[in-house]
Amino acid sequence: MFFVTRLRLRARENGFFFSKSLSFSSASVLKSDDVEGEDDAIEAEDRRRSVTDRAYWRRRIHSICAVRRNPDEALRILDGLCLRGYRPDSLNLSSVIHSLCDAGRFDEAHRRFLLFLASGFIPDERTCNVIIARLLYSRSPVSTLGVIHRLIGFKKEFVPSLTNYNRLMNQLCTIYRVIDAHKLVFDMRNRGHLPDVVTFTTLIGGYCEIRELEVAHKVFDEMRVCGIRPNSLTLSVLIGGFLKMRDVETGRKLMKELWEYMKNETDTSMKAAAFANLVDSMCREGYFNDIFEIAENMSLCESVNVEFAYGHMIDSLCRYRRNHGAARIVYIMKSKGLKPRRTSYNAIIHGLCKDGGCMRAYQLLEEGSEFEFFPSEYTYKLLMESLCKELDTGKARNVLELMLRKEGADRTRIYNIYLRGLCVMDNPTEILNVLVSMLQGDCRPDEYTLNTVINGLCKMGRVDDAMKVLDDMMTGKFCAPDAVTLNTVMCGLLAQGRAEEALDVLNRVMPENKIKPGVVAYNAVIRGLFKLHKGDEAMSVFGQLEKASVTADSTTYAIIIDGLCVTNKVDMAKKFWDDVIWPSGRHDAFVYAAFLKGLCQSGYLSDACHFLYDLADSGAIPNVVCYNTVIAECSRSGLKREAYQILEEMRKNGQAPDAVTWRILDKLHDSMDLTVERELISNPATSG
């Protein structure tokens, strides 16, 4: 009997009742009355229908799988039906497998299909091929091959389709199991299939990938012996193999043969695929000069669409980060009176910006005005940031003006990207000028614009200018400030030591604007006050946080622990840990690291070691940074034995030493013999 999942089943006179599966999700609790009524009606219909009504159950299972996309419910129903004597058919099986694959549950789909087979439910040949084709989308050829073998064991007369054979061979070749793929060729012949050009091309590509070029050439010759004419793609794949083996002369000879093949090829898509594969192979193996020769002499491959050929050259060169080479292809196109595709041209500029060639990218952007080229928004952002890092405001401004002329562009967003780039530069005047330009151009700044302006001014130390912008926001000249605005202003004030004004923003300005400070705001203020060595004020703000019913997080505790230790209040930090942090349960490796760092820097190495041991005993998980902090302090104090004890404790608790750990120990044993060091590592208890 076929069992899938447990199902509570209650018999009825004319059918049976499927109990609803338990669900504790919020969605099920808040389900609307209409949906509940519909489910009740379906449930009543299920009770009314007999097991022998196969047409109804086929529609029901298909609806659950295809419409509701709930294969688990379909499996529960099938399980219940099987208990009543129902035998699933090909349509039931196909619906369930397709639904599992749609949900990305390919491993389970493989297992379910095998369970169906083991239970004696063998679908027809067409359904088997459809299911195998769907399982191949999992890109798990070994699992799918196992399913095929089991299926043939149950159904001797079953023969996978040629398409499924070819797809399976291709997937096996991609994981370098070319021998297994070759065995499938013999298997398909034994079952009555004749390999086609796709079969041989796939196999040749697989052998070329594993550098078995002699075998690949034998397969190529065998292909001709079998009366199968190689197509352009077959020859292109073989050329790629010779290029991989650095046999350039043979590769170039075959290229001449390829051009002749392509002239006689009738399938345009096949010629395009062959050319694309050839260009990709050249780029992958570094034969860029050959690509430029082809680009300059396109008459060699005149059977390929010229615009497609140039476009693919550019795309392939950009993919392999040869952006200057791609720009050279553009100049070749222009010399022949052709225009590059906008997407290809955008890819060149984008790649140049990523590789540090923003000036060259800017030059290409200017030249792109000949055919009214505008970069994509993401490329514009990248170019703007690169130019601002080069401190070239003039060129950045020109790019801004170009993008503002782009039809359908979001002008505010274009300005925001420019402002964000200006924040890298120490140029507050330009930031304010952009704000004025937006107002003069009937482009109203939004919250993101003003937050960017205030953040940039604060980073440049122009907090007074930021406060003026904030005043304009509060008086209604701009949009009202939000929590991000005020948090940024408070951080800027604290960075300049203006703690009283920052506290005024927290305690007066935020409530006046009906903004409730969150944990991020409190964390920023507490951090700033501790940096100003105002520990009492910082702890007072923490008290406000608790009174305001704002839940402190691990970042809050890490800031406070670090601040108390820096201000030489280690005893207070210990008490805060015992009374507040540990009982709260909100502590992580950042809090542990802050406490350990503070203890070590304050000369409490023994307490740091005990704290580290207590954490592990309490079930907490200190990370490698925590252990490295204590080991580093032991090293500075010349305590070799203690350092290796911490190392051993680190390993016992499942943490592996990293490069920093070994660098610390290397400094500790700079003058020791290597054999002594190995003895210490293997047996730390006897070291000293």
From Swiss-Prot:
InterPro entries: Pentatricopeptide_rpt (IPR002885), PPR_P_subfamily (IPR050872), TPR-like_helical_dom_sf (IPR011990)
Keyword Repeat set for record: yes
Keywords, comma-separated and alphabetical: Repeat
Annotated transmembrane regions: none
PPR repeat residues: 53-88, 89-123, 124-158, 161-195, 196-230, 231-261, 271-305, 306-340, 341-375, 376-406, 411-445, 446-480, 482-517, 518-552, 553-583, 588-622, 623-657
PANTHER family: MITOCHONDRIAL GROUP I INTRON SPLICING FACTOR CCM1 (PTHR46128), PENTACOTRIPEPTIDE-REPEAT REGION OF PRORP DOMAIN-CONTAINING PROTEIN (PTHR46128:SF211)
Family membership noted in the UniProt record: Belongs to the PPR family. P subfamily.
Protein name: Pentatricopeptide repeat-containing protein At3g18020
Lineage: Eukaryota, Viridiplantae, Streptophyta, Embryophyta, Tracheophyta
